Amino acid sequence: MMAAVMNPSRQGSVIGTPKWRIPQWMLMPYLSVLGLVLPVLVYLLMMSHLGWRAPVFGDRAQSNAAAVAEGTVYLFVSETNKQYYDTIGGNYEVLVQPWRKYFKARGREYTEISDLDQVRPRANTVVILPSAIAIGADERRTLAGLQESGVSVLTTWASGTRNSDGEWTGWDFLQSLGIVVLGEREKLQGSERQITMSAETPLTLSQAPGQRVWLSPASEPMLRFRGDYIAARLTDWYRVETPGYPSEGAVVYTESRASRTVGFAFAETSWDASLNLIYPTLDDALLWLQRQPMIALANWPNGYHAAQLVEMDTEHLFGAANALADMLKARGIPGTFFLLTSEAIKDPKTVRRLANDRFDIAYHGDIHIGFAKQSEAEQQNRLTLMRQQLASLDPALARSARGFRAPTEAYEPITERLLQKMGIRYHLVDPSRTEAALPFFLKAKDVSPDDELVVMPRTQRDDLNQLSLTQDPQALLKALTDDMDNNRRDGGLGTLSVHSQNMSPGQPLNQAMAPYLDRLLQYQRSGDLWLASGEQVEQWWRARRNVAVVGSRQGLRLELDISVKGNAPVSGVTVLVMVPARGTVPTIRVTKVGAVQPVVKRVDDYTSQLVFPTLQPGNYAYQVNFSRRTK
């Protein structure tokens, strides 16, 4: 049964059926029992075949539930709302029941109340308003008083848009919570039920950056929110914001005086399609509302928030690769060139130049025909010929080339098995391979973790996509930059793929590329964006997997343990710290002899980084305190 009448200001609805997939990851907690008497939870190895990290926080298992501190979570289910939904032929239980299921699934205690006077304001208290459309004047005053005393609020959808008599009152109530409502979300080519997660915010520590989240069809139209901070953006499938509607959120958070607010722009009836993503977001949101410190291993090294790869599919008009190589070399930007070997053997001079300038040289197949729907034998023959052709130009280069990208992004599971067997270390794939903007490890039978293929999704529109929309160099530059900015905000791996046939002098891409690279360089110099080749991303992703971060909370102090396995040191390890109080900067004390002192960097009011120059294999221990505030 639907809740009915989801447009708070009028009857009816305009919601279509979304396209959605089941995300290709799952959390796997491992419980180790030591001895026959005392079971000890060692720490969580939360790894998916996508290879993205889930934060490890003390004894938190599959959720943040174990990390909840003192304080109470109240679920406000008022008679006023029940009566309002009854009058419009709806059923308020449909919106409340998902919360009860969430608390049961997470093993979290909560108190369901029908009157806000039942709230006992204590430290870390949270009131949840589950699509509470009808809120009376007395209830609004009571809630405002609770906020002044430090109670925080989590609200969903169109709470407070009507009074106790069911009369429309507008968006003023949500605005009083720090949420600006810009209206309803319009249909967007089938993506109106998709939101995109930003990484490394207090509300998304359990999410991969750029994670597409598909919401269930609902009679309640999604709203467009704006707040001080955005944890989930409104985008299309390519993670691009709607033109003319920048910086609009599906999940926002803010803080005003003593109270914090989290707002979800969609109703509870939308959750079912992605409970495995919604629940961790609720976990993190409640932790933030309860002012709990949190930690996580960052995705990228040296404090960078996001990464960017620029690569060329070097095929027809092979020599035009020199134009991109010139631009990259002049700026000191690494790049990857995927060589179509049947074309490469016709232009050995360009191949030698790319190799001599130490660009990442990788394979793009033998001929420009995809590998999909071909027999294993045919694929093997093609891969063998591909390597032989490059070896005819430079045997050492043919052996050292680590990456592969299938022509037309057409490949099959057998293709990747053959790549792994021949020693290829990474595969740059199509954007639909994963819903997240991160590399992942391809699990394969009888393949050791060290030899697993690193799969990297193309996360941005390529030059063919962009040139089909515009031939104007300035418009193209803006589109390329917008895609990069979106990924930079989300914190993922941005992958721009261009083609040699579009890089000749005078072509729009050639004209747009230099200023685009200048923008990339600007962000790298600011410490925000890591510019890396495919090989560098692959090597980092392998090194990062050898690092484990475990935290345990002692009041508002954290005990932090870091372990590095393997035989090689890891440089640039970055640990994210979500501080309990706005503007606090953590102080770090080494508690184990020989531990490396990190550099502490403030990111924003709620986030700091601990950046470790180099960590040798071994174990390290620290104490993290939160007594120092910024001025």
Region locations from a protein language model:
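Metal-dependent polysaccharide deacetylase catalytic core of the NodB/CE4 family, i.e.
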Residues: T161-N163, E167-D172, R185, Y304-Q308, ...
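Aromatic-Pro/Gly-enriched surface loop or interdomain linker
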Residues: P23-A123, S270, L328, F337
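Extracellular ligand-binding/catalytic regions of CAZymes and related secreted enzymes
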Residues: G12-L36, V40-T72, V240-A250, S256-E311, ...
